[in-house]
């Protein structure tokens, strides 16, 4: 922003106030409230106008230069806010804290008092219009204290607060799991990894991360003397949580959200999945971007926004708690066996609004009447579900049902107080039901009858003046006034009418008047209207207090409804898609019978194509095994690899799985090295990216890991690639001793199946027919002897000359492989590998005959009979 001090005598009082507020909020675009608009000035205006694609104007001068200005209307501000936030800006909102009349009491030149009431950032959003209903909006904080490090995260729109120990090497996988919108870090930290975070990064002062101050802030926030009842937190964990609370206090200007007591996630409590694996498996987001095509989109049958958020959380963080997995699967099994009960529950859940976020907005004093109506509707449906469920239910369902009751008094209060369809904003009034407050009803009657009297008064004035076009109108400047066209002005301004009608204003085409009785009526109407609005605001505050007094119970009910939604969604998915309950135990087994890929199967169904199910058994005599999979491109190796990883993930997320039978020993980690892409921004080739990811797997995978690797070593020379792939497989077998699927085109590696006890060969079957290859997509025991790359290239549409030349080269190379090394070298020396087969020569243009040439020269109309006869003899002679 351009410089300027408030003492500059060229600065108006309003601009001086703006400059002062702006100086207190550096790094944020300032939305400065002026009437019905938020205005922006100086550099803020230029930035906002470009980002929002709105007009940039000017307002006065500052230090001899024009002041850039732009603005957005209050009623549409949230849409503009969302655009700015998504483009990486932070926005400080300065509201008018008094009306102009109050300011004038302090003096004619007094400026309306304004204060920043909120700093809007990506991680601190609460409005429905700014949030994705089915996704969490996490704010994270990373803290390091000596040899300890921790990551804390909160979603202020739902009240969730969690923390975990997080050494720096684990930070990127944790951020990939949580997908936060904003990350808080200490400002002096070396942040070479910033570009990989994928969210807004906000540096804070080291004071914000002080662990001693953090402990005091947290105790005060939760009203306890010690945090020990919530867990034994390390200094780093306290530091991270304290930074979160400090930042929320800053951005919300003292109105802290309704956070639940912190949950400490233990290291190893969930399946470890790194960022590359999440991307390759497309768990919550497809490689093309967006949800469509991801595992999340394929399995999402939830009918509430909180249920959808819980589903994403479970898929992102599958548990390793065997007891919890069995409890969740038992609840899903119960509802698959009770289809009528399941449908009744889902029908009720469809009518449940997002109580979590409504409650958060109420706590932040950012709510409207519709948020109260959401609490009313959600609790009413909770009572209905609790009443319909049978007494005998699995433990998980029973615990959820217990939290749904006990809200009858609040529901009755909200039923009596609120109209059926409340308006969005409390300031508009009209949300308190008739009959709830007799005083309010009487005030409304006076207000509404006063408006009826206006109509009667207008009819009387028309009769007195004889002017049929006379109207009584209202605006915010004049209040109520009488308006006639300029053609009747002389009559109104002349006696006797001028004695009763007092001239107020003349505009183009109209003249405006008032009378004593109209002014008195206006006062009565305005008083009644203002009093009615004041009474409604009073009731709104009382209802807000009544709801927040029960916030803990309401929050538990909301979380229980989300749990029931997810259980019933998993049950519905299993019933419709014919999924089976997996057997999960503490063994090292991994036996999948007739497994399917949930996303690919769904896509094929749209085209009417059946999915070919396949078996997978990575248990050899009770010990982990590695399947070495060979076969052609396009046969389905990558799909087979991914589907088995997704089956393990779904099972530990508490879902049934797409298979006829599944026996899975608890999985601690899932690693995937599938697909290829370079990283130009960091100077990494495709092969380098592959090696980095493979190194991470070999260095981290434990004996409970599930690893899927596809074509390791393909990005370098053949023998280099084969050597790397060979050594990688041996390391997985000998050192990591984990369950693994290893797909390759290096057929030489199939010999390992006879040398390493835990390695077995498998291949994807194909059928050759009249020179074509037919993909059967069946995985069988055994090894492939070729990859059919030339046939796949022909299917891809390579030119026929290229395909023919490739066949020639392939035949020559394969023939050379069967001969001695010297003969093979001679063959390669003689073989022009990089010469394409010559195209067939173009047909030569036919030579013109003498007869044709002579005929072209003839002009028939110019020939006499004698000349024509002679010409025939000449042509005949040419033929001979």
Curated annotation (Swiss-Prot):
Binding, ATP: 631-638
Keywords, alphabetical: ATP-binding, DNA damage, DNA repair, DNA-binding, Nucleotide-binding
One MF term in the entry's GO annotations: ATP-dependent DNA damage sensor activity
GO cellular component annotations, sorted alphabetically?
A: cytosol
| InterPro entries (UniProt xref) | DNA_mismatch_repair_MutS (IPR005748), DNA_mismatch_repair_MutS-lik_N (IPR007695), DNA_mismatch_repair_MutS/MSH (IPR017261), DNA_mismatch_repair_MutS_C (IPR000432), DNA_mismatch_repair_MutS_clamp (IPR007861), DNA_mismatch_repair_MutS_core (IPR007696), DNA_mismatch_repair_MutS_N (IPR016151), DNA_mismatch_repair_MutS_sf (IPR036187)
Q: Which Gene3D superfamilies did the record assign? A: 1.10.1420.10, 6.10.140.430, DNA repair protein MutS, domain I, MutS, connector domain, P-loop containing nucleotide triphosphate hydrolases
Metal-binding: is it a keyword of this entry? no
Q: Which PROSITE patterns match?
A: DNA_MISMATCH_REPAIR_2 (PS00486)
Extract the ranges annotated as region (Disordered): 835-860
Q: Which SUPFAM superfamilies match?
A: DNA repair protein MutS, domain I, DNA repair protein MutS, domain II, DNA repair protein MutS, domain III, P-loop containing nucleoside triphosphate hydrolases
**Annotated GO biological process:** mismatch repair
Basic and acidic residues: which segments have biased composition? Answer: 850-860
Q: Does the keyword Transmembrane apply?
A: no
In terms of NCBIfam families, this protein maps to: mutS1, PRK05399.1
Q: Which family does it belong to?
A: Belongs to the DNA mismatch repair MutS family.
- Biological function: This protein is involved in the repair of mismatches in DNA. It is possible that it carries out the mismatch recognition step. This protein has a weak ATPase activity.
Name-wise, this protein is DNA mismatch repair protein MutS
Query: What is the scientific name of the source organism?
Result: Cereibacter sphaeroides (strain ATCC 17029 / ATH 2.4.9) (Rhodobacter sphaeroides)
């Amino acid at each position: 922003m351009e410089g300027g001090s408030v003492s500059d005598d060229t600065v108006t009082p309003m601009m001086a106030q703006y400059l002062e507020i702006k100086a207190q909020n550096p790094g944020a675009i300032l939305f400065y409230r002026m009437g019905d608009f938020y205005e922006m000035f100086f550099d803020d205006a230029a930035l906002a106008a470009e980002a929002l694609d709105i007009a940039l104007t000017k307002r006065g001068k500052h230090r001899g230069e024009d002041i850039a200005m732009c603005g957005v209307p209050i009623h549409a501000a949230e849409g503009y806010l969302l655009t700015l936030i998504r483009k990486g800006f932070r926005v400080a909102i300065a509201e008018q804290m008094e009306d102009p009349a109050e300011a004038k009491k302090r003096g004619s030149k007094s400026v309306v008092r304004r204060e920043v009431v909120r700093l809007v950032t990506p991680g601190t959003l609460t409005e429905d219009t700014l949030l994705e209903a089915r996704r969490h909006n996490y704010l994270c904080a990373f803290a390091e204290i000596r040899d300890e490090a921790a990551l804390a995260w909160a979603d202020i729109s739902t009240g969730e607060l969690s923390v975990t120990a997080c050494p720096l090497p684990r930070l990127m996988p944790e951020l990939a799991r949580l997908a936060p919108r904003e990350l808080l870090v200490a400002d002096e930290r070396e942040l070479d990894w910033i570009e990989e975070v994928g969210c807004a990064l906000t540096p804070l002062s080291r004071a914000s991360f002080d662990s001693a101050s953090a402990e005091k802030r947290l105790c005060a926030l939760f009203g306890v003397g010690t945090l020990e009842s919530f867990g034994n937190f390390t200094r780093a964990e306290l530091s991270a949580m304290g930074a979160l609370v400090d930042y929320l206090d800053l951005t919300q200007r003292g109105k802290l959200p309704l956070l639940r007591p912190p949950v400490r996630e233990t290291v190893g409590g969930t399946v470890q999945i790194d960022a590359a694996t999440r991307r390759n498996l497309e768990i919550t987001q497809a490689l093309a971007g967006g949800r469509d095509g991801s595992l999340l989109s394929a399995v999402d049958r939830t009918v509430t926004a909180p249920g959808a958020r819980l589903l994403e959380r479970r898929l992102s963080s599958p548990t390793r708690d065997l007891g919890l997995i069995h409890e969740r699967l038992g609840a899903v099994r119960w509802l698959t066996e009770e289809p009528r009960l399941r449908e009744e529950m889902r029908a009720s859940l469809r009518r449940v609004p997002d109580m979590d976020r409504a409650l958060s907005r109420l706590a932040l004093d950012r709510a409207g009447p519709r948020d109260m109506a959401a609490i009313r509707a959600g609790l009413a449906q909770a009572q209905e579900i609790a009443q319909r469920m049978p007494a005998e239910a699995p433990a998980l369902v029973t615990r959820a049902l217990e939290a749904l009751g006990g809200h009858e008094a609040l529901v009755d209060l909200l039923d009596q107080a609120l109209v059926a369809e409340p308006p969005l904003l409390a300031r508009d009034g009209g949300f308190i039901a008739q009959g709830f407050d007799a005083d309010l009803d009487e005030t409304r009657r006076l207000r509404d009858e006063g408006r009826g009297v206006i109509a009667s008064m207008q009819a009387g004035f028309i009769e007195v003046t004889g002017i049929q076009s006379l109207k009584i109108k209202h605006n915010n400047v004049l209040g109520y006034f009488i308006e006639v066209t300029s053609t009747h002005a002389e009559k109104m301004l002349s006696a006797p009418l001028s004695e009763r009608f007092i001239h107020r204003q003349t505009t183009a085409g109209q003249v405006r008047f008032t009378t004593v009785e109209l002014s008195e009526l206006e006062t009565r109407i305005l008083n009644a209207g203002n009093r009615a609005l004041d009474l409604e605001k009073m009731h709104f505050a009382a209802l807000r207090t009544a709801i927040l007094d029960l916030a803990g119970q309401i929050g538990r009910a909301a979380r229980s409804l989300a749990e029931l939604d997810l259980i019933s969604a998993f049950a519905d998915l299993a019933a419709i898609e014919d999924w089976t309950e997996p057997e999960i135990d503490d063994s090292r087994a991994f036996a999948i019978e007739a497994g399917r890929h949930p996303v690919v199967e769904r896509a094929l169904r749209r085209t009417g194509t059946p999915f070919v199910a396949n078996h997978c058994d990575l248990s050899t005599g009770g010990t982990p095994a590695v399947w070495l999979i060979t076969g052609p491109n396009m046969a389905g190796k990558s799909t087979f690899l991914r589907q088995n990883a997704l089956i393990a993930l779904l099972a530990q997320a508490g879902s049934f799985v797409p298979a006829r039978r599944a026996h899975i020993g608890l999985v601690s980690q899932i690693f995937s090295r599938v697909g290829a892409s370079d990283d130009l921004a960091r100077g990494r080739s495709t092969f380098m990216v592959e090696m980095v990811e493979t190194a991470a797997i070999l260095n981290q995978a434990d004996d409970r890991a599930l690893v899927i690797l596809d074509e390791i070593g393909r990005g370098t020379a053949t023998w280099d690639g084969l050597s790397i792939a060979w050594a990688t497989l041996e390391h997985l077998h000998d050192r990591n001793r984990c369950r693994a699927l290893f797909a390759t085109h290096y057929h030489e590696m199939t010999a390992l199946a006879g040398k390493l006890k835990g390695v077995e060969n498998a291949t994807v079957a194909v059928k050759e027919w009249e020179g074509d290859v037919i993909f059967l997509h069946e995985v069988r025991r055994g090894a492939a002897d070729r990859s059919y790359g030339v046939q796949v290239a022909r299917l891809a549409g390579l030119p026929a000359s290229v395909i023919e030349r490739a066949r020639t080269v392939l035949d020559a190379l394969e023939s050379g492989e069967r001969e001695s090394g010297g003969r093979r070298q001679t063959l390669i020396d003689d073989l022009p590998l990089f010469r394409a087969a010559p195209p067939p020569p173009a047909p030569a243009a036919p030579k013109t005959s003498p007869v044709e040439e002579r005929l072209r020269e003839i002009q028939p109309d110019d020939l006499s009979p004698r000349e024509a006869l002679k010409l025939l003899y000449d042509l005949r002679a040419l033929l001979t």
